[in-house]
Amino acid sequence: QFWKVKMKNTVKITFWIMLTAAVVLGINAGWDKYQEFRQAELARVMTVKDKKFDPGQLTEMAAALAAKPYVPPADNLPDELKKLNYDQYRDIRFSRENGPWYGKKLPFEIQFFHLGSLFLTSVPINEIVNGRIHPLKYSPAYFDYGKNRLNTDELSELGYAGFRLHNPLNTRKYYDELVSFLGASYFRALGKHQKYGLSARGLAIDTAVQTGEEFPIFREFWLVRPKRNDKSVTVYALLDSPSAAGIYTFVITPGENTVMDVDAKIFPRKEINKLGIAPLTSMYLFGENTKNKFDDHRPEVHDSDGLLVLNGNGEWLWRPLDNSKYLRISAFVDENPKGFGLLQRDRDPAHYLDFEANYEQRPSAWVEPVGDWGKGWIELVEIPSQQEIHDNVVTYWVPKEKAVPQKELHYRYRLYWFTKLPVKKVPGDITATYTGIGGVSGMLEDHKRKFVIDFDILNMQKEVEKGIATLEVSASEGEITGKHLMYNPVTKGLTAYIDFKPNGKTSELRASVVKKGKNISEIWSYQWLP
């Protein structure tokens, strides 16, 4: 999709955002060059007699790929596959019994995605068994094409668009879908009793930059066949784009919270203006604090409702998501961040009233850096949207130091897909943010705004009444004209009321509950746009 959004200064920019898949056009000759490179590299590092696979071979391959000019994937699919609509594409299903791990009593199974519709790029997928690499070959006989009438004779050399892994996640008797890799460098996963929502990506390049965003692709995959008692499965992915190449290792462990241990080695081809590490992509259409109202019977529609940050100083920040008229870019400057993620905090089905989408069952995702990431900032991009089919929220870590050629970048992190946050934190979750006209009933002040914030802090009624627990509020622009903290008899927690008088400029507001000089809640961080 091309989004034309009007910035505050009325300058129009064109912002390219990938919502479901990257469609990268190329030429067949270019794809042949990659295949030649691939075969040469495999022959050089992997097919020496009696030499078994090790991950270092793939690192060498990624570095060699980055040293060569970028070759875009080919656009050589039959028209009948390109023209498939959403429902027609979904009608093509992989037959489970054709999976390479089916019937082997392994803890995981592989199933594949067919090419077609938005997914036009063939991705080689390999299996590693006892240290040997085996290509997983495509056959149209592996798929049920449903009501589609396709000439499968022309599809024999097609290849796959991506894959998914299944695991007895919710019951021992059934292999549930656990994780999928499909489109560009997108992937997503599930914990127990969750439904797909937000996604992650391997790398983000120049997001929300006027020159346009670049979407790296996973060029090839290697999956290590697990043993019968293994609790985890390992996937290697070769990343490629005009600006960089890299090798990614994913060690995936299913459970109540599914965990991915990610190791990313990135080799820039050129200087990159803005590099996004550990990007997360989600959807927020409207919710409790949305000023841009929708004519919709549902109270809320979103896959995530806030950004949670644990910065290098140990502060917990909560930024409620919004869908305004303007492109919003927020930067949380930090050094060695301890974690960040997009959360679906509201789990009440009555707040969504959508018993097909089940937004209350969407997973949250938390990025936990391993080692020091240095100086930089966590960036949040919120894009105006009118439909829930569009992912319009992106967050990632931006290193302060520019990525330059011939300098390898190495990032490790643990990525949790969860319902309940898997790390220890301060109490005082911010559970809701409401906003509206300032003043009180009968004395409204339309030049002011009122914010109401619910804190999940229990057993604090006496401390609030005695002034031991207080509310601290600040605004970078405008004026805080009133603040009040009270016990909430309905939630049994605390509720804050803030009156804010804007001055026509963008303002960063902060609020927290403080006791004896220390925060006993998350810090509410809110960006006000005129």
Say what each PLM segment does.
Residues 237-286:
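Acidic, contiguous internal or C-terminal segments within carbohydrate-active enzymes
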Residues 50, 55-211:
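Solvent-exposed N-terminal domain segments of exported/luminal and surface proteins
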Residues 197-255, 371-382, 386, 390:
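Extended, loop-rich substrate-binding clefts of extracytoplasmic carbohydrate-active enzymes
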Residues 39-86, 92-95, 113, 351-530:
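Terminal accessory/anchoring regions of large secretory-pathway or extracellular enzymes
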Residues 87, 180-182, 194, 273, ...:
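A contiguous, surface-exposed recognition patch within enzymatic or periplasmic domains that forms
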Residues 1-6:
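Short, Lys/Arg-enriched N-terminal segments with co-localized hydrophobic residues
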